[in-house]
Amino acid sequence: MYTTPAPPEITRRSSEPSTQQGTLGSLEGEKGHLLFPGFVVLVTIFLVVIVTCILWSRKKQKKRRVPYLQVTPSLALPPPRQRAKNIYDFLPRQQTELGRHQLSGFSTESLLSRASDSPEPEVPQASGSLQKHRASVHAVEYTVGVYDNGTVAQMCGPLASSAHRVCDGTSRNNSISSKESNDYVNIPTAEDTSETLTCTKSTPESHLGLPSGQRLEFAEGGHAGCGKATDRTGVWAPGLQGSNSLSEGDDSSQSSNDYVNMTGLDLEDIQESRPRVAFQCCRDYENVPPVVANGSQLQTVEEVTSSTTDRGEPAQRTLPSVYHMAFRPSAWSEDGAMIPGEEASNGDSSDYENVLVPELEGKDWKQGPGTWHPSDERTPSDQAGKFCEAVYPAGSLATETSGEEV
């Protein structure tokens, strides 16, 4: 059969919608391919950010934990032991003290409790030593005190009226003393007690060490002013120039000026070489101004025995204590008077001060073993190395005689 061809306008209209459908499908496919990779990229970026944040936070936490290490207690360690109970705390006080001495082991609590409950053992020992010293002092019967120059005037009274005195024997023995102390009392040893008691009964004179070279002369009862010059009670403290009777060492003081040790002192040699001069016992050594000696101002203390008088025995009464001064005459005039202005000083002692020697014209002087009188035939040069003595009344020196002078 024979067909007829279609016109060209109809063929063009039918082909246009098919091409339009093909383009729309291709466009949708391309859009789907483009959205998937973009979404994947966004997800990966987000994950990376999250991971970096986590790592940064962990680093900060690690840095903070390094200086502060936290020690976690382990549960495997055993629990601490309980302290042992002190069974003696429940006992009475006496049983507690007895039980604590029997402990083989100790703890800090027991040591603290012992220290608080234990009494101090030093107190009874100190009291016992004081009682021993008191007992020894009362056995010898002399008072213990501190030597002081200001109390010398107060000491003169009780020394003059004392019935028990320390004799010459105790001064020759060693004394218990301290070489570096300025205030102390010489206490004789136990071996000297028997000799001290016997000497006080047998000998009429006794010697006591007084500070800084003082010498006290005092009379007691009816013995005052009677007898020879050697029967007087007196004390001579060394310290004058040229004294060799003391030995170097323990017999003398090396660093003190308030006392004089009488150990190793031979008083007889000192009395023979150095006569004594009496002064009123009031203060320490002072300057004595020159006195114009006359009958009322200068009085001699004469000791006259029974063989020097025919009418009666004269008796004298002096004050209980006087000063003693020894000086050396330096120059004499032809008529028997000492040249004024001469001074006698002591080179070895720092406690003495220079004393002016008074005039001797027509005055009575107490002659000692080494004195020189104007009536003597010897010259003053023979007596240059010896001492002379004089009596100076201080205040009122009462001298009474019960008989007429020859």
Curated annotation (Swiss-Prot):
The gene is Lax1. InterPro entries: LAX. Residues 55-406 are cytoplasmic. One of its GO terms (biological process) is negative regulation of MAPK cascade. The lineage of its organism: Eukaryota, Metazoa, Chordata, Craniata, Vertebrata. It comes from Rattus norvegicus (Rat). This is Lymphocyte transmembrane adapter 1. When phosphorylated, interacts with GRB2, PIK3R1 and GRAP2. It holds the Pfam family LAX. Phosphorylated on tyrosines upon TCR or BCR activation; which leads to the recruitment of GRB2, PIK3R1 and GRAP2. The modification Phosphotyrosine is found at Y184, Y259, Y285, Y352. It is a single-pass type III membrane protein. Negatively regulates TCR (T-cell antigen receptor)-mediated signaling in T-cells and BCR (B-cell antigen receptor)-mediated signaling in B-cells. Residues 242-258 have a biased composition (Low complexity). It comes from the Eukaryota. The chain crosses the membrane at residues 34-54. Its main location: membrane.
